[in-house]
């Protein structure tokens, strides 16, 4: 990874800040960058030191299948299901809600690449589920000078790099190669849920950040925004493993016909179902790929007894 400008870590003595000052200034910068997203990501935040009185789950602890299963089981209780397949998919979605926006926005708006590997994060759970993240060690942080506009000297933030491609590769590797991939593998092992479904959930949450940032602050749809989004979701291949990228195309646009007006409307749907319709609460996510077939989904969700009762009533009235 090539360096830009001064040798990484070198600054005249009078320009140096203490580690505490750097952490405080950087945390404030990262929190401020999240401001446009508060309408959708109300609880999301990023910490560089643990707050008092909040449960912090060490990311590395989730590599233990029993510990991970316990977290997934408890999350299933929150959403009303004992099915570990559904609980696993939506626990991953909740983790994505907490983890992805802070890391992605640091990359896109500030040119800062934070090491979000599972071993380097803590997951803050003020209400028993992932809400914020904490970066344990900043020593692996990298910075793209052309995107950075903070008040701290760049060399005290991290190692300068010379290309946006290097920045994206670093972030992709940490987030998806060293965090979500091992979690997906373990959840698949104990629940049997398809990795494709889990990757679909993670990719949707990752792309949701870009869409929300554009809706909340259209002026932030910069070249960096477009390049980063395309690199994450429009490449068929990735270099983290063999085979096609599981992040490719998290959504698709389809035409639907309004049953009352007969007008065609475009609608953005998930490419992969998240399984939430199987939870016995009668709900579907707003971007459900099964939404155009809502009646079919309702029938699938009905119990065998309800279907038999419906057929019996129909026979009597025939």
Predicted regions span which residues?
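Aromatic-residue detector
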Residues: 37, 55, 107, 133, ...
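Cys/His-clustered metal-coordination modules, chiefly Zn-binding fingers
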Residues: 224-318
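Generic N-terminal leader/targeting and pre-domain segments
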Residues: 1-92
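Serine/threonine-rich low-complexity intrinsically disordered regions
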Residues: 7-12, 18-25, 30, 57-58, ...
